[in-house]
């Protein structure tokens, strides 16, 4: 069926009003997408309670309407994220040989998690599982999978599996 997505639903009320309007008009809809910045900070992998105050009720109402919910997940971790320090200490973030570890400056200074590290993948999955999957969300949009860097200084980035120039193209497959 039809998947409804836009750049972007900013609140739970906005999203539910759109879904209700589809049903009111008798328009077919199978999936509705919550795109990026539904989280407090990149790397938190959960709904921002300020804008999404009751995800459980939202998911339940959508299911009652026969609509699945998809959420966008990004691999970026803001320095201020509740998960940043732990991920840094455990070696779950992409490293650099020189300069700052900031690889993307978009709505915060961020570093990508290292998808070539199996433990890092498990860490991110456990966050997504707890905050999305266990609530009933079974459809994910793994965005920013290139990964997208602000500075394409490929010889500077280091992954668990090796230098970016040698293993960087495997990132999207392992992120998935």
Predicted segment positions?
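Catalytic-domain carbohydrate-binding cleft regions of carbohydrate-active enzymes
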Residues: 1-176
